[in-house]
Structure formats: structure tokens, C-alpha cells
Amino acid sequence: LLMAVGALAGCGGEKKADDSKKMVTVGIAQLVEHGALDAANKGFVAGMASKGFKENENVKYDRQNAQADQSNLQNIAQRFVSNKVDLICAIATPTAQTMANATKDIPIVATAVTDYEVAKLAASNSEPKGNVTGTSDMNPIDQQLELLLKIAPQTKNIGTVYSSSEVNSQLQVDVLKKLAGDKGINVIEATVSTVNDIQQAAHSLVGKVDAVYVPTDNVMASSMPTLVAVTDEARLPVICGESDP
């Protein structure tokens, strides 16, 4: 897995807080507000602090949230480039992709990204090159499937709901289909574009599936209660990558 360095190592040599007294500026770009991404944001800042970078002492954060809007992400990227921030923390796959498209010079540390190679953020997950590095939030899908089958051992059809615009979600669904197929289980997909599509997508699976799997997906994580309201009524078990508490 790609490993992010907490200090301003970024994609180059390690640079500790004691090396310079100057104030550094870090742009933090978050795709949308939900529990998992909020925790990643706080964790990054805490990691920086553990390396000696204290907010308003030797590091200044420019925190931006795109509210799940691609045009907002592009504006945030241009803001960071124009302001010549020293480092960008990109939270979620679409965020990292937008930041990487905007600059090849500013180091980018990404988090809440499932697969850097699939997202075209790196040539290899094991050996990142260029200005992007980070951590992966890939689910143990094989273990999740085993758990689902323990809960609902008679499962023959699994429904999955995910965002059609997130390559990280498609990757996880492809893995699920392979693992489930090896067990003779069918996977039925229902994709969404926005949170407004979730209820209809969930209803489309009722009567067709025995259980539901939701990958790590930003659209889904921000509105899991909408899906669960449907699956609870239909008495369908749900296994998910993450959800906003």
C-alpha cells in the first residue's frame, strides 16, 4: 500500500518541523462532509501535529470542502495552485484526481482513496512516483462476503448500490462479483449519481436480492440512512464499507 508521511515528506525527502522556522501552508481539500472523511481530515492534522507541525505556530491550514460538487473541487484546486501552498491533503478519490490534474509540482498526500493505480494517481500502488502519495482505504471484501454469508447463509443474490462516478466503488464491486461468482452467487448492481437516487435504487433491488453490499463510496456513506430505511422494511441484511454515524 502507499504510505503517507505525516510531515512534509510528501513525495520527496523527509522535512521535519525543526528544519525551518517558516510558516508552511497546507491546503486540505475534502470531497463532502460525512463521518469517515471528517475523521480522515482530523487524523491528518493530528498526524502533522505529532511530527511537530502545530497549527498557527509553524503550519497554516486552508480547509476547503467541495460539498460533493466537481466544479467546487476544480475551484479549490486552482485556489491551492494560485496560492502556492506547500502541500495538499486530498481526501477521497475524486478529490485526489482533481488535485493531481491541477498540479504536478505541489506534493499531494491523499487519504480515503481505494486504489491509486486504478484511479490513475500512480503507476503502481507499491511504488508511487510523481507528486502523489497516500494511504488506501480498500475494504477486506473477502472477509465482508464471508460475514454476509454467516448472517444470511441462504444468499443466492446480492444487491449492491454505489455511485457510477467513483472508480473506487466500481473496483470494489468488480472484486465482489469475482468472489461471489466463485461461490455461485449472483451480484445485481444499482448505480446512483446523487443521494437523491438512493431510495429508488434501493427499491429496485427489493424482491430480487437476499442481501445488500455497499462499497466504500462517498455518495452512499453520506446518506446510508436512506438506503437502510428501505432494506430494513424489506428485512434485507446490509454489509457496508463505511457509513456516516
What are these regions (language model features)?
Residues 66-123, 214-232, 236-241:
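Beta-alpha junction/loop-to-helix N-cap segments that form part of ligand/metal-binding clefts
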Residues 26, 44, 133-180:
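An alpha-beta-alpha
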Residues 60-82, 190-205:
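Structural motif
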Residues 86-88, 156, 210:
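Conserved acidic residues
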Residues 41, 45, 74-77, 93-96, ...:
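Extracytoplasmic/secreted envelope proteins and their assembly/folding machinery
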Residues 23-51, 62-71, 165-167, 219, ...:
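Extracytoplasmic "Venus flytrap"
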Residues 1-25, 50, 54:
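Short, low-complexity disordered leader/linker segments with a strong preference
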